[in-house]
């Protein structure tokens, strides 16, 4: 005979199963929006690569019969005189003549393969735009503008969602590191806590006092307690009118609690998974705003992140050293994209697409913390100046 399970195990199994069923919708609700955004971005990049490869990759039959190109080549032959001896004057004329070279004359169909077009699409919706690859046809230019019009907001949506994940990871990692080393909370001076989180008790005095008086009852307003400085009659009339207007507004408006309950908990109709997805969509971008990490820590993360890519990139881009690779990665992640460094093998760099997205978000977090710190410094300076002006005798 088989051994029967103890009653405690029977009771624990349904409880554990219930907890697992409850956690699965929440986990899916957190991961599903980000995965959907990322899948949409990948699909958008693939569709754009196919379109640009078809539009810009077509051979131009009129390129060989272009009169401007023929005249350019004839003048070039006249300058060179079809020999290898070039005098100083002819060299100067040659440099001036080459400045009239148009990029569409050098266009080749193999330059717009599917992978090259995919690399171009990544530079468009990421707003990097290196500059060495761009459309030259009229249809390609209009298609590029339309593609960027929808691709850039989609890219920012993906960055915002990934930013919440990175903010959560960085915040928890720093908290555990701080607890492991038993560090005090104010060990770093450059923290962004006063600006990232608004204190609930930081309301102005002129807003807090009328709110307290209005919340009082009518009897308390009509029969106030005796005090040393009795309020003026005009102040009492104004406060009484505010109280009456507020009571009328509360009577005219229907109770909103049932409506808020039905709107905030659509799981009664849509299910727990749908409710979790909707609630997570409403909270997109909130984790970055609540992030509280010292600036030296995030600066160290940025330096380590760029250094890793700068050490790996020269393995296939042999012409780049560590310094040039570090400069290229920084220009890419900050979306500056000068275009002064051109990758010989951009197809391999496509594997760094996730690296670029994550790196752009890390730099955005660093810039956000720096912005908060500068704003805090500016506010402190303004408060100091205002206090000096108040203390000065007039």
From Swiss-Prot:
The UniProt entry, under InterPro entries, shows: 2pore_dom_K_chnl (IPR003280), 2pore_dom_K_chnl_TASK (IPR003092), K_chnl_dom (IPR013099)
Q: Where in the cell is it found?
A: Cell membrane
Where it mainly occurs, coarsely classed, is membrane
Q: Quote the annotated effect of residue 276 to A.
A: Increases the open probability of the channel, without affecting the single channel conductance. Confers resistance to stimulation by calcineurin. Mice carrying the mutant allele display increased Treg numbers in thymus and spleen
From the Swiss-Prot or TrEMBL record, give the protein name. Potassium channel subfamily K member 18
Q: What does gene deletion cause?
A: Splenomegaly due to increased lymphocyte proliferation.
Q: Which gene encodes it?
A: Kcnk18
* Residues engaged in binding K(+) 2: 128-129
Tissue specificity here reads: Detected in brain cortex, cerebellum, dorsal root ganglion, spinal cord and testis. High expression in trigeminal ganglion (at protein level), also expressed in autonomic nervous system ganglia such as the stellate ganglion and paravertebral sympathetic ganglia. Expressed in all adult spinal cord and brain regions, with slightly higher expression in thalamus, hypothalamus, hippocampus and posterior corte (at protein level). In non-neuronal tissues, substantial expression found in lung and heart and weal expression in liver, testis, kidney, small intestine and spleen.
What is the similarity comment for this entry?
A: Belongs to the two pore domain potassium channel (TC 1.A.1.8) family.
Supply the PANTHER family for this chain.
POTASSIUM CHANNEL SUBFAMILY K MEMBER 18 (PTHR11003:SF346), POTASSIUM CHANNEL, SUBFAMILY K (PTHR11003)
Alphabetically ordered keywords of this record: Cell membrane, Disulfide bond, Glycoprotein, Ion channel, Ion transport, Membrane, Metal-binding, Phosphoprotein, Potassium, Potassium channel, Potassium transport, Transmembrane, Transmembrane helix, Transport
Disease named in the record? Frameshift variants combined with alternative initiation of translation result in the production of aberrant truncated KCNK18/TRESK proteins with dominant negative effects on KCNK2/TREK-1 and KCNK10/TREK-2 channel subunits, causing trigeminal neuron hyperexcitability and migraine-like phenotype, similarly to TREK-1 and TREK-2 double knockout mice.
As stated in the Swiss-Prot or TrEMBL entry, residues carrying the post-translational modification Phosphoserine are: 264, 276
């Amino acid at each position: 005979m088989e051994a029967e399970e103890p009653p405690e195990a029977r009771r624990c199994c349904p409880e554990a199963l219930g907890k697992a069923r409850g956690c699965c919708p929440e986990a899916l609700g957190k991961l599903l929006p980000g995965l959907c955004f990322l899948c949409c971005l990948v699909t958008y990049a693939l569709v754009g690569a196919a379109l640009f490869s078809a539009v810009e990759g077509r051979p131009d039959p009129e390129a060989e019969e272009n009169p401007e190109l023929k005249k350019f080549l004839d003048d070039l032959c006249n300058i060179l005189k079809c020999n290898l001896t070039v005098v100083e004057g002819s060299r100067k004329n040659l440099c001036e003549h080459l400045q009239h070279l148009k990029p569409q004359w050098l266009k080749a169909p193999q330059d717009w393969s599917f992978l090259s077009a995919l690399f171009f699409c990544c530079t468009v919706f990421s707003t990097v735009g290196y500059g060495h690859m761009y459309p030259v046809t009229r249809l390609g230019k209009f298609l590029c503008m339309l593609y960027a019009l929808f691709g850039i907001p989609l890219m920012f949506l993906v960055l915002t969602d990934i930013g919440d994940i990175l903010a959560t990871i960085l915040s928890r990692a720093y908290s555990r590191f701080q607890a492991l080393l038993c560090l005090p909370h104010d060990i770093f001076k450059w923290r962004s806590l006063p600006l990232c989180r608004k204190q609930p008790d930081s309301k102005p005095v002129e807003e807090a006092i009328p709110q307290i008086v209005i919340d009082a009852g009518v009897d308390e307003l009509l029969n106030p307690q005796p005090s040393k400085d009795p309020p003026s009659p005009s102040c009492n009339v104004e406060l009484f009118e505010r109280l009456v207007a507020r009571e009328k507004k509360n009577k005219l408006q229907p109770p909103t609690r049932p409506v808020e309950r039905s709107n905030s908990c659509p799981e009664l109709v849509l299910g727990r998974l749908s409710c979790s997805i909707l609630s997570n969509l409403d909270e997109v971008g909130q984790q970055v705003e609540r992030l509280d990490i010292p600036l030296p820590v995030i600066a160290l993360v940025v330096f380590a992140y760029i250094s890793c890519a700068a050490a790996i990139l020269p393995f296939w881009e042999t012409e780049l050293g560590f310094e040039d690779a570090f400069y290229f990665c920084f220009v890419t992640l900050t979306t500056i994209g000068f275009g002064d460094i051109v990758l010989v093998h951009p197809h391999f760099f496509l594997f760094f697409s996730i690296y670029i997205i994550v790196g752009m978000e890390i730099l955005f977090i660093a810039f956000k913390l720096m912005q908060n710190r500068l704003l805090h410094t500016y506010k402190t300076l303004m408060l100091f100046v205002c206090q000096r002006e108040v203390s000065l005798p007039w």
